[in-house]
Amino acid sequence: YAGDTILYKKGKPVKTWWGPEPRIAFRYAIDGQQSIKAGFSMNYQYVHLVSSSNSTLPTDIWVPSSKWVEPQRGLQYSLGYFRNFKDNSYEFSAEFYYKDLKNQIEFSEDFIQELGQEVEMGYVFGDGWSYGMELFAKKSKGKFNGWLGYTLSYTWRRFDDLNSGNKFPARYDRRHDISLNLVYEINDKLSLGGTWVYAT
């Protein structure tokens, strides 16, 4: 078989990517027990997990950003309310978030790699977004303490070349997530604890 092959010397740069990652946090204290927090962050990811659902064989591969694959970018916005009770023995918070995702990557629906064919020929690129809320309650004082958390989240992807251009749930979408952690302090040196997690 004769084909075009590109070889790079060890340590030779192929493509250079960079991006700013600003983070902004804001807190407003209503009083000594209540506060409101808001935040914004921008993040880049330069290594990507590419998945395919049209094959019976494992096709999840990690690929770096390159001349053909741009870095993934995420913008996240958050807003939360925080409250302490009874001399900070109890804590409660409710947070809402929205995340905008660019340059998401998947395999095309009909891609089957042939001998000598660059795997990059099977990539398709699109956008994603996720949003939801997180509720959290914690008891931190006393012999019996612990915390309870609940997360409701929606994670979507949309590609022009997948699912007729319609949005679809991301592979790792977890709509509901409940976590419970309990600890009982028998004495200063011994305690019993347990954790329960439910996710859909």
Residue ranges and their predicted role:
Residues 2-7, 20, 49-57, 62-64, ...:
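Outer-membrane beta-barrel translocator domains and adjoining extracellular loop/strand segments
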Residues 18, 26-29, 42, 71, ...:
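Residue-level signature of outer-membrane beta-barrel architecture
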Residues 1-33, 46, 162:
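Signature of Gram-negative outer-membrane beta-barrel scaffolds
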Residues 1, 38-42, 60, 81, ...:
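Transmembrane beta-barrel strands of outer-membrane/channel proteins
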Residues 37-41, 47, 51, 70-121:
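Membrane-embedded beta-barrel scaffold of Gram-negative outer-membrane proteins
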Residues 33-36, 87-92, 143-146, 188-192:
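Repeated loop/turn-to-beta-strand initiation elements of outer-membrane beta-barrel proteins
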Residues 20-26, 36, 65, 75-79, ...:
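Hydrophobic, lipid-facing positions within transmembrane beta-strands of outer-membrane proteins
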Residues 97-100, 117-200:
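Gram-negative outer-membrane beta-barrel transporters
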